[in-house]
Amino acid sequence: MIGIYFSGTGNTKYCLEKFVALYDRNIEITPLEDEGTIEKVAHHKDIIFAYPIYYSNLPKIVQDFICGNSDVWKGKHIFIIATMGLFSGDGAGVSARLFKRYGAHIWGGLHLKMPDCICDVKALKRTPDQNKQIVIQAEECIKSAVYNLKNGTPTKNGLSFWCHIAGLLGQRLWFYRKTQAYSDKIQINWYVL
C-alpha cells in the first residue's frame, strides 16, 4: 500500500500522515508532484489518495495527475481522503468518478473539514481556537475511519448519488468560474509585502 497526496497548505499531508500512523506505519507516503510517484503507484495495488477540494472541484494538478496517468489506475483499490474548508458534497466522489473511468475500484472515501487558507470569504474565516477545534474534530474522524477500514466497513463519504447532486448544486455550478480564473501566471504585489 502507498499514500499519495497533494497538499497546498500542508493540511492534506497532515491528515494523510495521521491516517497512515493509525492504519499502518509502514505505508510510504509521497506527494503526487514528485518525479518518481507514478512508478511507485505502479508497484502497489492499494492506494490512499488524498487532496484538498476547491469549491467542490479537484485542484487542476490532481485532475491532470489522474487523467495524465490513466493507464496506471486499472485494477487499483483506492481509498480517497478529501480535505475541505466547509462543505464539498462529493469531494471524494469527484476523483472517484475519474478513477472508475480508468478501471480502479473505490474502496472508500473520507471527508475532513480543516482550517481554510482562503481569506477573502467570510464564511471560511475562523479564530485560532476555532481552527484548533476543527483539527481535533478531523483527527477524531480519522480515528473512526481507520477503525471502520480495519473492520471491513470503510467510510464512504462523498461517494453516493445524493452527494454528487449536493456537490453539483451546492457549489460546483455556483463557483465554477472562481476556479476557471486560476492561472499559472504568478503575480506578486511587492508593495503589499
Q: What are these language model-derived features?
A:
Residues 186-193:
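Cysteine-centered iron-sulfur cluster-binding motifs in ferredoxin-type domains/subunits
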Residues 2-3, 7-15, 19-33, 37, ...:
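FMN-binding flavodoxin-like domain, especially the glycine-rich phosphate-binding loop
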